[in-house]
Amino acid sequence: MSKASKEALLERALNKITKSQTNTNVAEAHEEIESNYAYINEKQLKRLVELHDTEFKDKCVVPLQRLYYKYSDTVLCDGDLQNWAELIDRDIRVLETTLAKVRDNQSGG
């Protein structure tokens, strides 16, 4: 067999391998791994979001709802917007007085 025919035979074999449209066992295994990886990531992401949402709800939303339900009836019984404003004004004054006392204690003590 001549050198040219060997090169042509080698060229055909390489073209057959590189331009093949059929998957090899390795390629099929690789595709399966990638699809499993995507599936696992999707499941893990969903679970992570659920955990985050649950934790956020338990630590933030539920306590605020409890406070709202505990005090909203009391405030609503007091009446209109004027009463609300008076209650808020009173609370702000209490906070201002408390801050002033804290500052006085820090500067004096």
Swiss-Prot record:
The keyword Zinc-finger does not apply. Component of the biogenesis of lysosome-related organelles complex-1 (BLOC-1), a complex involved in endosomal cargo sorting. Component of the biogenesis of lysosome-related organelles complex-1 (BLOC-1). Keywords: Endosome, Transport. The keyword Transport applies. It is found in: Endosome. The lineage of its organism: Eukaryota, Fungi, Dikarya, Ascomycota, Saccharomycotina. Belongs to the BLOC1S1 family. GO terms for cellular component: endosome. The gene is BLS1. This is Biogenesis of lysosome-related organelles complex 1 subunit BLS1. It comes from the Eukaryota.
